[in-house]
């Protein structure tokens, strides 16, 4: 029986991530990402990469965002569109449980899109030009206990397809590394 795990796009392709600058956070996430992937590969787990909604909508040269910037009809519709084939794949694997075991889906906590338990919010909008309170706006960014928009839509689609009880959704998050490591067996 083949074991399968679905992962956020940047778990396999960090080039898709927005440019980061906090080296300590980068290193902690990278170490866990490598540990997670090594464990998955050494256990013979098949890895399916989810699409990145930010990259497929905004490309590589995008600014960092917070989840409340993505909490709109247009971004949610984009997420659903790119998730439709993923839901179809999940259903097909689950319908053939004699051959496949779906271990779950792994997001990336802290992401405005792919956070499972944690996402970032802030009062960010508007132009940078002439803005006198830019630092005040940037300082509103904080980590909160809530899903990112892509994962929120994914969970809704799992529920709409009666898959919620059959598909575990967890995350890669350096401060809580067992969340992603424990899903692999």
Features from the language model and the residues they span:
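Short catalytic/ligand-binding loop motif for oxyanion handling, primarily in non-cytosolic enzymes
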Residues: 15, 57-59, 111-117, 121, ...
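Short, surface-exposed acidic-centric catalytic microdomains
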Residues: 23-71
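Divalent-metal-activated hydrolytic enzyme cores
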Residues: 43, 60-68, 72-98, 126-185
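N-terminal nucleotide-binding beta1-loop-alpha1 segment
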Residues: 4, 8
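Short amphipathic alpha-helices and their capping/turn segments at secondary-structure boundaries
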Residues: 1-2, 31-46, 86-103
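Short, glycine/charged-enriched secondary-structure capping and boundary segments
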Residues: 20-23, 119-123
